[in-house]
């Protein structure tokens, strides 16, 4: 899904691809960032030193993700399951991403559940849950 406008985010392409597949038909935009409202709120329900628990706005999210490729490169996303909520604005997606931590050379395999609220075909709220232990182990475990 990479184009020159989003070349700095190429390390996240498998994430973008699996998420956009899960939100197909519910959001507008060819790229993940195009599907996000300018004032969207992102909540991260896990704690890592230096990582925020909440981000407000698409530009702030892009700034947060801009250096992702310095630490992690994803090579695939899979295991997508899409759940529809009683609230028609809410889509719940389960998915996995796989890649490698650059600092350790360790495999990075993680599972996510994202609760996504959509209004006017744009993401306005994103609540993210993941396997924190998998991320911590990939980052701090013995080098591959």
Across the structure, where does each feature detected by a protein language model lie?
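Short, low-complexity N-terminal intrinsically disordered segments enriched in polar/charged residues
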Residues: 1-35, 140-144
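A beta-strand edge to alpha-helix "cap/lid" segment located at domain peripheries
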Residues: 2-6, 66-144
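Intrinsic disorder/low-complexity signal
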Residues: 12, 16, 29, 38, ...
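Short, solvent-exposed loop/turn segments that connect beta-strands within catalytic domains
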Residues: 24-26, 48-49, 89, 103-105
